[in-house]
Design a protein with these regions (language model features):
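Eukaryotic intrinsically disordered, low-complexity regulatory linkers and tails enriched in Ser/Thr/Pro
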Residues: 1-149
Length: 149
């Protein structure tokens, strides 16, 4: 896992993501963070992971129910409840890499904060199943649309 490797190397996790070989991590335009997060609604259900270094929370849900309150951008659908301090977001990536448990490629959109820690990760595929062509196309569309120039 990228977090464990980052800890072993003594670097922020975002640096491990940036160093992935062969275009496996494409940096996205984090300046378009709201548009990017809203685009995740079109994916349908996704596996969302949030970790604070002590606890990891995983939920399978769908993006939607967007609103802004103070410093937070909120995602509040029937299956997902996230409150993002958007001013803390510093990087975003479309990541395609082998899963840590089974080696089957995972497709994800990952957001990192100013310290280089993962804010949250959104997996389009997770858990050992090869992604259907439709999911791969959705991932590629996000990767191309939001690619940092």
């Amino acid at each position: 896992m990228t977090l464990q490797l980052a800890r072993q190397l003594g670097v922020p996790e975002v640096e491990v993501i940036r160093a992935l070989p062969d275009g496996r991590a494409v940096e996205l335009d984090v300046g378009r963070w709201e548009e990017l997060i809203r685009a995740l609604e079109g994916l349908g259900r996704a596996h969302v992971i949030v970790s604070n270094g002590c606890v990891t929370c995983e939920v399978n849900g769908q993006f939607g129910g967007f609103s802004t309150w103070g410093e937070f951008f909120n995602v509040q659908s029937k299956s997902l409840d996230l409150h993002v301090r958007h001013a803390e977001l510093a990087a975003a990536f479309a990541v395609e890499k082998p899963g840590h448990m089974d080696g089957v490629n995972t497709l994800s959109v990952q957001f990192y904060d100013r310290s280089g820690a993962a804010a949250f990760k959104v997996f389009l595929t997770f858990g050992g199943q090869r992604p259907p062509a439709e999911r791969v196309a959705q991932f590629e569309a996000i990767r191309q649309r939001f690619r940092k120039t």
